[in-house]
C-alpha cells in the first residue's frame, strides 16, 4: 500500500511539473544614447515566438517552455543582436538588450546575423562558452576549467585529476583570468603558486553568464598572458524578484541567492563548503582536502549613463595528510606531499560611464594569496632536525585600470592605462640536494610597481565583409633596469578577417605578447640575502594564426585554424636545465629556484572544430588538435620536447534534450601519451638526497626521452528538471570514465627505508630502492541535486 501511495504522489508530482510555461520580460535600449527603442522585434531563438517593444522599450513573451534560450532582437537601421543564453523558469531575470546602429549601409546588401560571435579584434582563437555548456557538459561537474577542455588546443588531465590549463603547448602559468573586467590571480582551490592550476574550481557556476575563451589574438587591454585569457561575464541579479538556490554537487554543497536591494541595486551571492575531506577518508585516500569559498556581485545603476559593479571572490583551503591508511601507494604520497594551507581573495569595483559614443570605465581591485607548506621527513614532527620544508608566502596586488572606448560609425577606438602595486613576502626554510645537501633559509620582502599603456583601433566594412584591428600595448616595472624600459616590451598585434563568400570567412592574426615571471622567481634569494634572479627578463611569445570558418546555416559552424608560437627569454632552471614553463602541474610552488632567461621554445599545430546548436534539442561539438611543443637552451641548442607535447587531442561532446525536461550528454576524450623522464637511480638512492625531498630524482640528461601510451575516456551525464510556478528542482548523475579505462603511468621509484651500507660515511650511504607499478583509472560517479525557490 505504501508503494502505491508513493507512486501516486510521484505521478502527480511529475504531472504538475510537466507543461509549465513562463514569461520572458525585458527592455531594449540604444547602446549609444541609452534610450529605449520602440518597435524592436524580439524572438525566442528556436521557438518562433516573440513580441515587439513598446514606447518604453519593454517587451514580454508569454507561454515559453522552461529551458535555456537565446533572444534575437532586430529592427530596421540597427544590427541584429543575439543575446547570451538565459535559463527560463519561475525566476527568469529581466533581460536588457543593447542594440547598435548600423553604419553606412550599402544599397542592396544584407548582413546576416549569427549566434557564433566574431569580433574584429579576435576573429580567430576566440570561443564563447554559454550557459548550456557550463551547466550540462559531461564530465565537467559544472567546473569551468574542465568545460574549457572540450575546446581545440586545450589539453586535459586524464581521470579529472587537475584543472591545469595547457593551451596550445604552453605551460599552466601562461593564462590570465577576468571577472567582469576585474583580474583575478587564479580560479582554483589548492592552486600551484607560480602557476594557475589546481584540483577544484573556485568560481561557482551559478554566477556565470558566459565565458570568452581566447587561445590567441588577445585584446590589447588584457595583458600579461602568453597562452590564454578567460574573460568571465557574471549574471546580474534579478531586479524583480529575490530567489534562493541550494545545490549538492560532486564535491561541495552550495547556497546562492539572487535578487535586488531597492530599485537600483541587484545582487548575487554564493557560499560553498566542500565535503571532500570526509569523502576521501571514507575512500581511504592519503590526502584530506577541505575548502570553503564565497563570492558576490553588487550592481547599481545610478541612472541610464552611470553604473557601479562591486564584486568579491575568496577561498580557504586546508589539506591534511591521512596517516590511517596503509599500502605502498599511500606510503609514497605521504612521503613527499606537504601539508597545504591557503587563503585567497579578490575584491574589486568597476565604474562605467556612458557618454554617447564614448564609454569610460575605471577598474580598481585588490588580490591576496597566503600560501603555507610544511613538511617533515617521514612526517615526524618530534624534532626540528626532521624539517625539510617550511614556507609562508604572501602575494598582494592592487590594480587600477582606466580606459575609454569610442565608436564612430565604422570605427572603434579603445585606449587606456594600467597601474599595479605588488607586494611579495616569503619566509622559506628548504632542504635541497644537488651534489650535496643545501639549506635555503631566507626572507623576502619585495615591492614592485608596474605600469602599462594600451590602445586598439577596429574597423568594420559597411557590409561587414572585411574587418581589421590594429593594437599595441607596452608594460614596464621597477624590478630591474631592463624591465623599466617600455620600448623593450612593445607588443603590437594585427587581426584581419574577410568573408570570401556567404558565411565563409578567412581570418588571421599576428602579435607579440609579454609576461612577467612569477613573484616566486622574482623574490627568490640566496642565504646571503641577495636576489638571485635580478637579471630575469619579461617572457615573450610571438603568435601567428590563420583560420577558415564556415557557417552552413545559423546553427552550425565548421572551422580550421593553424597556429605558430615562438618563445624567447624563457626562465631556465640552473639546477636541472628545464624551463619553468614545463613545470607547475602538481601541488606546491614553482619558480623558487635560481633561473636564467636563456631558453627558447616553439609550439605549432592545427585545430579543427565542428559545432552544431539546435535550441532546446542538441548541443554537439567536436574538436581535433594536432601539434608539437618544444624548447631549447639558447639559440644554438637542440630542440627537446616539452612536458606538454602530447601531439594530439580529440574531443566529441554532445547533450540532447528529450521531452519532459530530460537530457543526456556524452563526451569522448582522447589525448596522446605524455612524455616522462627516467629516474636517476644513483642520486635517488643516496640517503641525504632522499631525505631532502622524500621522492626520487629525475635524470635530466634523459629529459622526456620516454612516452606513455595514449589515453581515452568516456563520460556520461543525465539530467532531469522539474519546474513549478514558484520553484525548480533538478537532479543529475555525472559519471567520469564510465568504461574504467586504465591510465598507464611510469613506475615509481621509492626507498624501502633500509640502508644497504650503514657503516659508510653519511654522504655515501644508500637506501635499498624498490619500484611500485602505477596505474589508475576508476569509474567516478557524482550525483548532483539543485533546488531553487
Predicted regions and their residues:
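Surface-exposed extracellular loop regions of Gram-negative outer-membrane beta-barrel proteins
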Residues: 188, 324-329, 425-432, 502-544, ...
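Flexible loop and strand-edge segments within Gram-negative outer membrane beta-barrel domains
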Residues: 276, 307-354, 360, 368-395, ...
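Periplasmic N-terminal accessory/gating domains of Gram-negative outer-membrane beta-barrel systems
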Residues: 79, 85-87, 112, 116-218, ...
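Gram-negative outer-membrane beta-barrel transporters
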Residues: 460-466, 564-566, 587-678
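Outer membrane beta-barrel strand-and-loop segments of large Gram-negative receptors
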Residues: 391-393, 397-403, 441-454, 533, ...
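Periplasm-facing N-terminal accessory domains of Gram-negative outer-membrane beta-barrel systems
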Residues: 18-108, 119
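C-terminal beta-signal and adjacent terminal beta-strands/loops
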Residues: 568, 620, 670-694, 709-713, ...
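Transmembrane beta-barrel wall of Gram-negative outer-membrane proteins
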Residues: 249-273, 285-319, 338-361, 366, ...
Amino acid at each position: 500500500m505504501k508503494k502505491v501511495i508513493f507512486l501516486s504522489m510521484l505521478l502527480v508530482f511529475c504531472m504538475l511539473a510537466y507543461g509549465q510555461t513562463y514569461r520572458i520580460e525585458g527592455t531594449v535600449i540604444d547602446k549609444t544614447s541609452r534610450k529605449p527603442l520602440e518597435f524592436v522585434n524580439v524572438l525566442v531563438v528556436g521557438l518562433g515566438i516573440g513580441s515587439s517593444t513598446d514606447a518604453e522599450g519593454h517587451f514580454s513573451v508569454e507561454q515559453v517552455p522552461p529551458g535555456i534560450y537565446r533572444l534575437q532582437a532586430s529592427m530596421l537601421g540597427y544590427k541584429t543582436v543575439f543575446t547570451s543564453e538565459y535559463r527560463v523558469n519561475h525566476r527568469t531575470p529581466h533581460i536588457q538588450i543593447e542594440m547598435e546602429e548600423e553604419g553606412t549601409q550599402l544599397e542592396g546588401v544584407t548582413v546576416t546575423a549569427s549566434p557564433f560571435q566574431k569580433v574584429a579584434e579576435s576573429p580567430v582563437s576566440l570561443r564563447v562558452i554559454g550557459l548550456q555548456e557550463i551547466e550540462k557538459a559531461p564530465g565537467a561537474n559544472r567546473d569551468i576549467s574542465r568545460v574549457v577542455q572540450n575546446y581545440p588546443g586545450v589539453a586535459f588531465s586524464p581521470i579529472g585529476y587537475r584543472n591545469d590549463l595547457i593551451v596550445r603547448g604552453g605551460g599552466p602559468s601562461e593564462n590570465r583570468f577576468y571577472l567582469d573586467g576585474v583580474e583575478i590571480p587564479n580560479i582554483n582551490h589548492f592552486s600551484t603558486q607560480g602557476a594557475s592550476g589546481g584540483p577544484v574550481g573556485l568560481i561557482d557556476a551559478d554566477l556565470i553568464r558566459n565565458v570568452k575563451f581566447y587561445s590567441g589574438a588577445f585584446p590589447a587591454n588584457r595583458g600579461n598572458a602568453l597562452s590564454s585569457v578567460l574573460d568571465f561575464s557574471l549574471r546580474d541579479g534579478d531586479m524583480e524578484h529575490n530567489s534562493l538556490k541550494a545545490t549538492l554537487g560532486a564535491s561541495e554543497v552550495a547556497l546562492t541567492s539572487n535578487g535586488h536591494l531597492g530599485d537600483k541595486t541587484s545582487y548575487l551571492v554564493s557560499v560553498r563548503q566542500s565535503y571532500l575531506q570526509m569523502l576521501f577518508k571514507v575512500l581511504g585516500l592519503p590526502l584530506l582536502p577541505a575548502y570553503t569559498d564565497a563570492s558576490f556581485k553588487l550592481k547599481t545603476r545610478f541612472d541610464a549613463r552611470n553604473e557601479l559593479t562591486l564584486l568579491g571572490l575568496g577561498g580557504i583551503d586546508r589539506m591534511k595528510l591521512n596517516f590511517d591508511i596503509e599500502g605502498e601507494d599511500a606510503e609514497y604520497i605521504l612521503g613527499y606531499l606537504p601539508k597545504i594551507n591557503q587563503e585567497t581573495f579578490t575584491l574589486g569595483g568597476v565604474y562605467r560611464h556612458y557618454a554617447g559614443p564614448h564609454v569610460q570605465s575605471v577598474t580598481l581591485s585588490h588580490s591576496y594569496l597566503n600560501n603555507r607548506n610544511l613538511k617533515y621527513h617521514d612526517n615526524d614532527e618530534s624534532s626540528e632536525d626532521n624539517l625539510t620544508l617550511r614556507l609562508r608566502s604572501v602575494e598582494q596586488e592592487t590594480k587600477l585600470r582606466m580606459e575609454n572606448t569610442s565608436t564612430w560609425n565604422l570605427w572603434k577606438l579603445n585606449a587606456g592605462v594600467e597601474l599595479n602595486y605588488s607586494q611579495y613576502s616569503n619566509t622559506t626554510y628548504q632542504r635541497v640536494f644537488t651534489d650535496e645537501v643545501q639549506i635555503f633559509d631566507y626572507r623576502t620582502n619585495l615591492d614592485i610597481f608596474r605600469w602599462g599603456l594600451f590602445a586598439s583601433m577596429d574597423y568594420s566594412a559597411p557590409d561587414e565583409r572585411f574587418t581589421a584591428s590594429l593594437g599595441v600595448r607596452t608594460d614596464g616595472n621597477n624590478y630591474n633596469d631592463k624591465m623599466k624600459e617600455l620600448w623593450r616590451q612593445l607588443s603590437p598585434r594585427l587581426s584581419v578577417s574577410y568573408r570570401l563568400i556567404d558565411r565563409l570567412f578567412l581570418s588571421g592574426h599576428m602579435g607579440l605578447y609579454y609576461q612577467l615571471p612569477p613573484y616566486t622567481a622574482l623574490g627568490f634569494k640566496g642565504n646571503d640575502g641577495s636576489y638571485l634572479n635580478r637579471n630575469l627578463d619579461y617572457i615573450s611569445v610571438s603568435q601567428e594564426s590563420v583560420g577558415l570558418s564556415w557557417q552552413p546555416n545559423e546553427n552550425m559552424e565548421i572551422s580550421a585554424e593553424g597556429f605558430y608560437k615562438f618563445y624567447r627569454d624563457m626562465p631556465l632552471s640552473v639546477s636541472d636545465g628545464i624551463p619553468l614553463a614545463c613545470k607547475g602541474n602538481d601541488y606546491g610552488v614553482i619558480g623558487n629556484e635560481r633561473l636564467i632567461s636563456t631558453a627558447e621554445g616553439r609550439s605549432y599545430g592545427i585545430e579543427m572544430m565542428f559545432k552544431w546548436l539546435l535550441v532546446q534539442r542538441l548541443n554537439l561539438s567536436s574538436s581535433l588538435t594536432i601539434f608539437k611543443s618544444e624548447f631549447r637552451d639558447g639559440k644554438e641548442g637542440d630542440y627537446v620536447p616539452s612536458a606538454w607535447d602530447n601531439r594530439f587531442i580529440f574531443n566529441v561532446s554532445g547533450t540532447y534534450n528529450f521531452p519532459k525536461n530530460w537530457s543526456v550528454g556524452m563526451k569522448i576524450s582522447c589525448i596522446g601519451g605524455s612524455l616522462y623522464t627516467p629516474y636517476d637511480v644513483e642520486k635517488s638512492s643516496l640517503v641525504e638526497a632522499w631525505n631532502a625531498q622524500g621522492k626520487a630524482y629525475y635524470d635530466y640528461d634523459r629529459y622526456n626521452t620516454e612516452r606513455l601510451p595514449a589515453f581515452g575516456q568516456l563520460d556520461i551525464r543525465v539530467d532531469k528538471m522539474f519546474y513549478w510556478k514558484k520553484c525548480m528542482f533538478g537532479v543529475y548523475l555525472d559519471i567520469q570514465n564510465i568504461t574504467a579505462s586504465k591510465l598507464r603511468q611510469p613506475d615509481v621509484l621509492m626507498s624501502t627505508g633500509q640502508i644497504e651500507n650503514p657503516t659508510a660515511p653519511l654522504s655515501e650511504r644508500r637506501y635499498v630502492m624498490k619500484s611500485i607499478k602505477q596505474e589508475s583509472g576508476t569509474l567516478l560517479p557524482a550525483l548532483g541535486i539543485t533546488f531553487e525557490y
